[in-house]
Amino acid sequence: MGIDFHLIANFGALALITLAGPAVIFILFYRRGAL
């Protein structure tokens, strides 16, 4: 079960980075008033 939890944790972290990356970039540009 430990291995499964590790895989799920890694997949969750990867998904979080994939979703948060563009969101952070969007927020940075939005706060700069570039959009």
From Swiss-Prot:
It is found in: Cellular thylakoid membrane. GO terms for biological process: photosynthesis. The keyword Membrane applies. One of its GO terms (cellular component) is photosystem II. The chain crosses the membrane at residues 7-27. Signal peptide: none annotated. Keywords: Membrane, Photosynthesis, Photosystem II, Thylakoid, Transmembrane, Transmembrane helix. InterPro entries: PSII_Ycf12_core-subunit (IPR010284). Pfam families: PSII_Ycf12. Disulfide bonds: none annotated. Its main location: membrane. The keyword Membrane applies. It is a single-pass membrane protein. Belongs to the Psb30/Ycf12 family. PSII is composed of 1 copy each of membrane proteins PsbA, PsbB, PsbC, PsbD, PsbE, PsbF, PsbH, PsbI, PsbJ, PsbK, PsbL, PsbM, PsbT, PsbX, PsbY, PsbZ, Psb30/Ycf12, peripheral proteins PsbO, CyanoQ (PsbQ), PsbU, PsbV and a large number of cofactors. It forms dimeric complexes. A core subunit of photosystem II (PSII), probably helps stabilize the reaction center. This is Photosystem II reaction center protein Psb30. The lineage of its organism: Bacteria, Bacillati, Cyanobacteriota, Cyanophyceae, Synechococcales.
